[in-house]
Amino acid sequence: IMLDGEDITYQKEHVRSKVIGHLFQDPLKGTAPHMTIEENMALAYLRTTTSKNAYFSRIKAADKKKFREQLALLDMGLEDRMKQPVGLLSGGQRQALTLLMATMVTPKILLLDEHTAALDPATAEKVLNLTKKIVSEQNITCLMVTHNMHQALELGNRTLMMDSGNIVLDVSGEEREKMSVDDLLEQFAVRAGKALDNDRILFSKVEA
């Protein structure tokens, strides 16, 4: 696995985490529930440091101010709850916080593993809009896994479809811009030799 010209295939996880941000489908996986919002953000902020004791250093006033300002951008009122344990937050709030933590120090690549799939529609849309805003403003290279075909065509600048671990379709540019969800599913059927039968994918086809 090459990232920015460097082979990271066998790098230790704590080394890779300095340059790779990630969000899981489960909003409970990206944060430490028994630690406060402030403490979770401090861990994320300090993950790129070379000091072995950095994670245990005292959170400075300047850092707290920065955390508060960044939380305010989420428009969820979390900036006024920095001393509360993350375990008290809703799934959507935790996922938004995880997104913020993953991009506090701009990563070389952001991996999104169906990060809105477990959220209710309204919350999912809010988190997705936050994602688009942060990725655009920080110019982050992003790889997003989704079963939603509308999202697969609407977001980013390239769509890849996989079957049994293999890439069977790769579209971008003008071809992608003109492609509808029906076109995408038809192309997949031609390349993979079979139609999609995943209920989640077929349900997303009739949305919007």
What does each model-found stretch correspond to?
Residues 121-123:
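Helix N-cap at the start of a conserved alpha-helix in ABC-type nucleotide-binding domains
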Residues 1-16, 58, 173-175:
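ABC ATPase NBD Q-loop/coupling interface
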Residues 102-103:
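ABC ATPase C-loop
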